[in-house]
């Protein structure tokens, strides 16, 4: 009986650690139809570091149908996207803009990119939007980052 207790306790600990690590590692896909595969991502404020991986599951090149992942306060995302269009290639983001909390480079079909960011910059219950800054994509390619 003791062995069963310890086996269950160990399994429970491993499962809770796996669940915790999954909220510190995020994955999102983008496609040639100007879509992310989710409208909502969740992250734990307690994470020391968050790793986000963007995978472009389409086939078109970055100069035709490039995608990136950008995080900002919801109140800033449209202005950042518009400034990014003016900034142009390769990443369609204004350089050194403090409103950008995290961002990947623009990638093309079949590529993936990962970044790490510090969730200490974020507030539990804050209003955060992720989006693609490739020209015109932010209108369709956006979603919420929920900090728990």
Predicted regions and their residues:
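Sec/Tat signal peptide C-region and signal peptidase I cleavage site
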Residues: 15-21
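N-terminal edge beta-strand
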Residues: 23-49
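Extracellular/periplasmic metallocenter environments
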Residues: 102-148
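Positively charged n-region of N-terminal signal peptides that target proteins for export
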Residues: 1-4
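Bacterial N-terminal signal peptides
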Residues: 6-14
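Extracytoplasmic/periplasmic copper-protein system
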Residues: 22-31, 75-93, 135-148
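Mid-chain, structured segments of secreted extracytoplasmic proteins
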Residues: 60-61, 65-108
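Beta-strand cores of secreted/periplasmic/IMS beta-sandwich domains, seen most often
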Residues: 40-64, 69-71, 114-123, 127, ...
